[in-house]
Amino acid sequence: MKTIERSVKGGYRISTQDTVYETKVVVNAAGVYADEFHNMVSEKKLHITPRKGEYFLLDKTTGAHVSHTVFTLPGKYGKGVLVTPTVHGNLLIGPTATDVEQKEGTDTTMQGMEEICKKAQHSVKEIPFRQVITGFAGLRAHEDGHEFVIQEVEDAPGFIDCAGIESPGLTSAPAIGRLAAEIVRNVLELKENPAFCKTRKGILNPAELTAKERNELIRKNPAYGRIVCRCEMISEGEILDSIHRPLGATTMDGIKRRTRAGMGRCQAGFCTPKTMEILERELKIRQEEITKNGAGSEMIVGRNKDGKI
């Protein structure tokens, strides 16, 4: 998105790289960019600082090292480095908390890794760091007043901020969504749709079935018998479901987030080619168009020899 401006028709005019949208309401949930969009329409300025948090993810063999989340004492920048078992059996350690200037600054650093190792061992001993399978970083949107900003902007009717969402933002997300929906309903004077379905069917997990049920599933749909991701035992059937459901996956990370394909010990080293073939076939696109997580993260950047990819 490039700009947001008031529309002569009322509402807002949003210009993107590809097109222009006219809308009566904008919900500004742009994370570390929320201040930039807010400041395009309001005289009361908002400032957000990207706060980087780095993590380690350990192999599933380490998940039982602790039985519950272990926190250190909270500090100025958050709750400190924690050690927690995940619901899928891994061990997650982090985050750090470092203010940065770059709104895309999700690179990991040697300094961050050393900080995680040092601080985590204050609360948990003998952490098997040799079992780390990946490290990553994310950015929290720190608002100067250290507050969640969830409201219709006073001098920009119809522009709704959901900004400055730090910890416990994940826990708060369902309530934030309901509050934002209520504000939108009031602005547009909407009436409840009695036919609206509030729930959606999740992606079938064959691992939760009995052997008899799994065999019957594979008999009806052989795609569930073709394992694509061996680390997490994710089948082609699950990947197809993730692609073809409403708001389905269109990227490699989209599939990973919905199915865990690529989240295991080899970090997609084995299953990437097959997953790309499935995306190519199902979305009817070329493999050169497939991205890891949107524009600028293309999986294939060129050819190293003649012939088909």
Language-model segments: which ranges?
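Flavin-dependent oxidoreductases
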Residues: 4-94, 98-109, 118, 124-127, ...
